[in-house]
């Protein structure tokens, strides 16, 4: 016989062999357990016989010739008395047709044995009452049918075939033994859990002590901070001194530009009306480079001329000569520390050069000068003015400008310079949507301000809106055609859009505005305070156009008119 492929003659599939096995089995144990049992009618059911050989037929005749048939009913009664009746505990799904006709578990590759009639009948009354522990295979099937896996079910072993009646009492005794082992195992697990809880409690106690110690240390440090803070309270005069020290600190974090460098060949040097000439040149729309020479002559004649230094700084920043403009504006503030126009212009120049902290400190000085009550309330509300990181300083100054803007929120009384300062603060933190709102508000208040239109164009360009930026720059040049910085910004926008020919045209025009006429009528370019940004950007445009032959031709002192004629640009 083979457990892997049982045939018709195998004991697992032969009903007569199973009958004979039951009749010859020792039933002394069952007899001792059923002294009070009565014989009842046996309701054995046998299915149609299969073909038998001679040996099987002889076994059958021997069995049939016995005086009385083997009675299984008393044994079944005794089993019902020994084992708990699980019939009432069976779920309705288990009492259905599938429960009445259970199918033994079949392992793949192994033939499923045929089930005899008596075995089927016995399984109707006994096998459904025996608890088993499910295998992983049976658990998967239960879940797939929507049934929760039963606990303590032990699956059949397909190699042993259907459960035999003679093995039931042995299984009862084995189950009692297994229950005893289970109880011992459970007691052991409970003891282990108690030991783990004790160990955990022992570990938590030092941790709680550590937390308590840390809280005490924190309280002590906090008390020390409060005492130190109370001892270091500053008066208003001390606040003012600290504020000035703060400004000087941030102003010194940038590059030291030193003294302003004057142009050697200046046609206005000996003109006593150089300052007035410079004003007229700006009003008439002359080149900014010519006006710069006039203001240079004015401050050389009178180094204490505040307005001349201010005008010189404004002209040089608009002429795309940022460093020269910063030097002039700082000199102006040395002479007049509370000059509002110089403070705002210098703060914007600091932002352009990347000195953000110096710009924030300059804007803070601007608020303190124009809106002292706002600064005073801020000092009283927030005595800690020691924060020197970029973000904290920007936040502090931004709050000051917002409070100043709330004093005149709208209408003719709105301070456009407050909106400009707010826009610069937001611009430095790359918050371009807020920047646009501020500069647009400033333009609404003064629609003909070329500087405001140029700032709006820069914000639009950094917001990835080059078309709108070009419109803003174009409006700037309509208001001030000699605004070199606006032409430079316009050229950069054209490069970003791939319109290199237009970019080159505006950049060359900006360079041509640096040329001035000398006393003999010839054109020349200032040798001092030259702009490198225009030259470097023009080289980028030629590189993008694949005109490498022109890159080396672009250098300081370039004669733009001759360059255009020679290279047809």
UniProtKB/Swiss-Prot annotation:
Region (Disordered): 23-42
Region Amphipathic helix 1 (AH1), annotated ranges: 10-32
Sequence motif: WxxxF/Y motif 1, positions: 118-122
Positions of TPR repeats: 272-305, 306-339, 340-377, 378-415, 416-449, 450-483, 484-517
Keyword set includes Repeat: yes
Signal peptide range in chain numbering: none
Main localization, broad class: cytoplasm
Pfam families reported in the protein's UniProt record: TPR_1, TPR_16
PTM description: Monoubiquitinated at Cys-9 by PEX2 during PEX5 passage through the retrotranslocation channel: monoubiquitination acts as a signal for PEX5 extraction and is required for proper export from peroxisomes and recycling. When PEX5 recycling is compromised, polyubiquitinated at Lys-21 by PEX10 during its passage through the retrotranslocation channel, leading to its degradation.
Compartment(s): Cytoplasm, Cytosol; Peroxisome matrix
Region of interest called Amphipathic helix 2 (AH2), as start-end residue ranges on this chain: 57-72
Amphipathic helix 4 (AH4): annotated span: 218-234
SMART domains: TPR
Domain notes: The TPR repeats mediate interaction with proteins containing a C-terminal PTS1-type tripeptide peroxisomal targeting signal (SKL-type).
Protein known as: Peroxisomal targeting signal receptor
């Amino acid at each position: 016989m083979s457990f892997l492929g049982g045939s018709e003659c195998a004991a697992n599939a032969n009903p007569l062999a199973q009958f004979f096995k039951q009749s010859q089995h020792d039933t002394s144990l069952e007899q001792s357990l059923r002294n009070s049992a009565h014989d009842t009618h046996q309701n054995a059911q046998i299915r149609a016989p299969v073909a038998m050989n001679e040996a099987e037929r002889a076994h059958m005749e021997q069995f049939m010739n016995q005086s009385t048939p083997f009675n299984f009913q008393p044994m079944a009664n005794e089993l019902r008395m020994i084992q708990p009746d699980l019939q009432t505990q069976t779920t309705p799904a288990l009492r259905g047709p599938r429960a009445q006709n259970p199918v033994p578990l079949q392992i793949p590759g192994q033939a499923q044995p045929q089930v005899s009639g008596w075995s089927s009948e016995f399984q109707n009354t006994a096998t459904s009452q025996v608890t088993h522990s499910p295998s992983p295979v049976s658990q998967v099937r239960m879940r797939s049918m929507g049934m929760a896996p039963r606990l303590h079910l032990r699956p059949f072993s397909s190699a042993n075939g259907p459960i035999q009646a003679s093995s039931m009492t042995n299984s009862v005794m084995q189950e009692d033994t297994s229950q005893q082992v289970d109880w011992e195992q459970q007691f052991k697990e409970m003891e282990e859990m108690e030991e783990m809880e004790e160990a955990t409690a022992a570990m938590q106690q030092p941790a709680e002590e550590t937390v308590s110690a840390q809280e005490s240390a924190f309280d002590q440090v906090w008390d020390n901070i409060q005492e130190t803070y109370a001892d270091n309270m500053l008066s208003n005069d001390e606040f003012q001194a600290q504020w000035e020290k703060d400004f000087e600190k941030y102003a010194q974090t940038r590059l030291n530009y030193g003294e302003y460098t004057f142009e050697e060949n200046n046609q206005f040097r000996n003109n006593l009306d150089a300052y007035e000439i410079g004003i007229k040149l700006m009003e008439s729309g002359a080149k900014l480079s010519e006006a710069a020479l006039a203001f240079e002559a004015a401050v050389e004649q009178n180094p204490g001329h505040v307005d001349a230094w201010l005008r010189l700084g404004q002209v040089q920043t608009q002429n795309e000569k940022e460093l020269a403009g910063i030097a002039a504006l700082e000199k102006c503030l040395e002479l007049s520390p509370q000059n509002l126009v110089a403070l705002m212009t210098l703060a914007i120049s600091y932002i352009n050069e990347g000195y953000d902290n110096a710009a924030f400190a300059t804007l803070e000085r601007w608020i303190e000068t124009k809106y002292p009550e706002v600064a005073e309330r801020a000092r009283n509300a927030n005595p800690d003015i020691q924060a020197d990181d970029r973000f904290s300083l920007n936040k502090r100054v931004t709050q000051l400008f917002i409070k100043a803007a709330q004093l005149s929120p709208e209408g003719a009384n709105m301070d456009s310079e407050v909106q400009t300062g707010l826009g610069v603060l937001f611009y430095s933190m790359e918050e371009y949507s807020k920047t646009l709102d501020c500069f647009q508000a400033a333009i609404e208040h003064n629609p003909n301000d070329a500087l405001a239109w140029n700032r709006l164009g820069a914000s639009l360009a950094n917001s990835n809106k080059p078309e709108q930026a070009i419109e803003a720059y174009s409006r700037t040049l309509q208001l001030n055609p000699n605004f070199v910085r606006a032409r430079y910004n316009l050229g950069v926008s054209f490069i970003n859009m791939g319109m290199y020919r237009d970019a080159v045209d505006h950049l060359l025009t900006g360079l041509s505005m640096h040329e001035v006429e000398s006393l003999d009528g010839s054109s020349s370019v200032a040798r001092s305070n030259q702009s490198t940004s225009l030259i470097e950007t023009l080289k980028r445009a030629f590189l993008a156009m694949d005109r490498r032959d022109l890159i080396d031709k672009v250098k300081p002192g370039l004669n733009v008119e001759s360059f255009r004629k020679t290279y047809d640009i």
